[in-house]
Design a protein with these regions (language model features):
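Non-catalytic substrate-recognition and accessory regions of acyl/acetyltransferase enzymes
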Residues: 2-290, 311-317, 331-414
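Short beta-alpha junction loops
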Residues: 319-326
C-alpha cells in the first residue's frame, strides 16, 4: 500500500486496525506541498493558538522536515484525515509513538503540527457558535501551556512538545467540548455514578451515599487509594431501597466514607444527583495560584457562559476528580490556604487515584527553584509515612454561593 512500507514499525502497529482507511486516505496524498505543512499555514495557526514567534519558526522547520520524510508525511496525512476530515473512532492515541529517531529533540512538535492542522475546523465551529474572542484565546492557549515546561512531554524529555496521549486530551478543546472560563476549564458531561446525592425537602440538607459494592479502607478512602489496598477492617458499602426508604453508607462532605448505614425516608429525602445527571466537568490547567475569589468568579462565569451558549443542555452540578481534592490536605495545609478553602466550598468524595508515596507531579517549585511552603509541608507529610490520594467533588448549581461552605454548615443525618 502506498507509503506504508516507508512507515516505521511502531506506527504500522498502531495503524494496522485501520489499514483500509489508511489505503483510502493515501490515495489523496499530494506528491508534494501538503497545505497544512506549509510555512504560511503553520505561522497562521500557531499565531491563532498564541504560540510565540520563535516557536512558530521552529514549527515551520519541523514541518519542512516532515514534508521531506515519506513516512512522517504519510502518517501526518493519515492523522489529518482521521481527526479533522472524517473522524476515525477507536484510535487509541495514548499508544502512538513519538518520532524521536527522525525529529530528535523536536519529536514532540510532530503532534503539535497535527493539532495545528485542525485549526481551520475549530475556527469554523467557534464561528457557528458565536464564541467570544477572549474565551477562544484563553481556551486554545492550552496547547502552548502543554508544550512548555509545565507539560508532561517537557518534564519527560526536556524539550517542548506534546505526546500522542496529550493530543488525545486536547481533542476535547479541538472538538469545542472544553472551554477556559477564567482560571478553570469546563465542559458538558454527566456523572459517572460513584455516589448518589439526596436532598431533604424539609431542611434542604444534602447527603451523598456511596454506590453499591464499593470497598473502602478503614479510614474511609477507596480501597487502592494512595496505593494502599486489602487492609484488615476494610469494608464494603451497600446501597438498597424499598418503597419507603433508601439505605446506604454516607460520604461526609470532607470526602470520607462513613462505616455507618443510614436510612433516608423517601417521603423526605429526594434523589437529586445520580449516574447520568448532567454536569459541568471541571479541569484545572497549569497557571497561577488558585486565588479563592478568582476561583469563585470562574465557576460563576462558567454557569453564565454555558447557559448562554448551550441553553439546550442544562446541567445540575459541577464535578471533577483531581489531586487538589485529596481529603488529607486540611491535615497538612493551613486552613486559609487556597486548596483547603476550595475544598470547603464543595462536597468531596473518595475515588481510586493518587500518587501514593510520591509528590504530586503538579506541585511546582517557586522562583529560582526554591521549595514553596506547600512543597515543604508535603515533603514532611511524606517523610512521616503519609500517602497522597486524589479525590472527587460535586457542587450542585442550586447550592453555589461562593464563600458560604454550604455542605459544611448543614446538619447531617448521622
Amino acid at each position: 500500500m502506498r507509503g506504508f512500507d516507508t512507515v516505521d514499525s511502531p506506527w504500522q502497529e498502531c495503524m494496522a486496525p485501520f489499514i483500509a482507511v489508511w489505503h483510502e486516505t493515501q490515495k489523496d496524498l499530494p506528491a508534494s506541498g501538503i497545505r497544512f505543512l506549509s510555512s504560511g499555514f503553520i505561522e497562521r495557526s500557531a499565531r491563532y493558538c498564541g504560540i510565540a514567534q520563535d516557536m512558530a519558526e521552529k514549527l515551520v522547520r519541523v514541518a519542512r522536515t516532515i514534508e521531506e520524510d515519506p513516512g512522517l508525511r504519510s502518517v501526518a496525512w493519515f492523522l489529518h484525515h482521521g481527526l479533522w476530515i472524517n473522524r476515525i473512532h477507536g484510535i487509541r492515541m495514548s499508544e502512538w509513538p513519538v518520532p524521536t529517531e527522525t525529529l530528535k529533540e523536536d519529536a514532540g512538535l510532530f503532534y503539535v503540527i497535527v493539532l495545528l492542522a485542525g485549526v481551520p475546523r475549530l475556527q469554523g465551529i467557534y464561528r457557528r457558535l458565536g464564541m467570544p474572542s477572549g474565551v477562544v484565546r484563553d481556551t486554545v492557549a492550552e496547547l502552548d501551556r502543554r508544550m512548555g515546561e509545565s507539560g508532561s512531554f517537557f518534564r519527560t524529555y526536556g524539550s517542548p512538545g506534546i505526546d500522542a496521549k496529550t493530543l488525545g486530551w486536547l481533542l476535547m478543546i479541538w472538538d469545542a467540548e472544553l472551554y477556559q472560563i477564567g482560571r478553570f476549564q469546563f465542559g458538558l458531561s454527566s456523572h459517572s455514578g460513584v455516589i448518589r446525592a439526596y436532598r431533604s425537602t424539609s431542611t434542604g440538607s444534602l447527603v451523598a451515599l456511596s454506590e453499591d459494592d464499593r470497598i473502602f479502607l478503614p479510614n474511609g478512602l477507596n480501597d487502592g487509594s494512595g496505593g494502599i489496598s486489602g487492609l484488615e477492617n476494610s469494608w464494603t458499602a451497600t446501597l438498597e431501597g424499598t418503597e419507603n426508604e433508601t439505605m446506604g453508607y454516607p460520604i461526609s462532605p470532607s470526602g470520607f466514607a462513613v462505616n455507618k448505614k443510614i436510612r433516608l425516608p423517601k417521603c423526605e429525602w429526594v434523589e437529586v444527583f445520580s449516574k447520568g445527571s448532567p454536569t459541568l466537568d471541571f479541569h484545572i490547567p497549569a497557571g497561577p495560584p488558585m486565588d479563592f475569589e478568582v476561583c469563585g468568579r470562574s465557576l460563576q462565569d462558567a454557569i453564565s457562559f454555558f447557559r448562554q451558549f448551550f441553553p439546550e443542555k442544562p446541567f445540575v452540578a459541577f464535578e471533577s476528580w483531581s489531586w487538589i481534592l485529596d481529603p488529607v490536605f486540611p491535615d497538612i495545609l493551613p486552613p486559609d490556604s487556597n486548596l483547603v478553602r476550595f475544598q470547603r466550598e464543595v462536597y468531596l468524595y473518595p475515588c481510586l487515584r493518587g500518587s501514593g508515596d510520591s509528590m504530586p507531579a503538579e506541585v511546582r517549585r517557586g522562583e529560582g527553584g526554591r521549595a514553596t511552603s506547600m512543597e515543604k509541608r508535603f515533603s514532611e507529610y511524606l517523610s512521616s509515612g503519609g500517602k497522597f490520594n486524589s479525590g472527587g467533588f460535586f457542587l450542585m448549581i442550586e447550592d453555589f454561593d461562593w464563600g458560604s461552605q454550604p455542605y459544611h454548615q448543614q446538619e447531617l443525618p448521622w
